Amino acid sequence: FQTYTPFVDLSIDRAGEEVAVQVTAVMRLSHAALPAMITRGEGAIINVSSMLSFSGSLNHPFMPKRSVYAATKAFVTTFSELLAAELQGTGVRVQALCPAVVRTEFHDIDGKPVLRPNVPVMEPADVVKASLAGLRQGDTICIPALEERDRLSAVADANRALFDAGRGAELASRYR
């Protein structure tokens, strides 16, 4: 499900359908599966997110057409990270799988095939292989094409620093 349409041109009902599929369904399915996994003391949830979950600060020509889709994927990534933290010690693992473009019919649905020469496309079997390897390695976020794992660690470190710096009780001087 995707709505690659500028938000102002997107039917609010269609946007709501995307949120229902990409956000509400992820929560409901996770909530339904977790009790049995916790009781067994083992299990794994793999939530399919996207590299677009990291795109909020990008200034790229195609980004304005993906606000709802990218926001739902940002939810999936953050939800998965925080759920994994909540479940530490239970034997249940959670992973946000964040591929870029994968060779599926996904992009053909709206009549805009993505298979152009300048777009790197990963094979579905490779995405699955990366996800399962990431689970074995304990990765909460799996980015199949990311060679340098330190880049993901740098993002986490930057997020922690921003979170800590932004928790003051007084306005920053630029807002006074």
Model-derived features: where do they sit?
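A short, exposed helix-loop element centered on a Lys and neighboring polar residues
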Residues: 30-31, 81
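Short, flexible catalytic-loop segment of classical short-chain dehydrogenase/reductase
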Residues: 99-109
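Active-site-adjacent segment of SDR/Rossmann-fold oxidoreductases
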Residues: 55, 61, 81-93
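Substrate-binding pocket helix/loop in short-chain dehydrogenase/reductase
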Residues: 6-7, 14-17
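The catalytic Tyr-X3-Lys active-site helix of short-chain dehydrogenase/reductase
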Residues: 62-75, 79
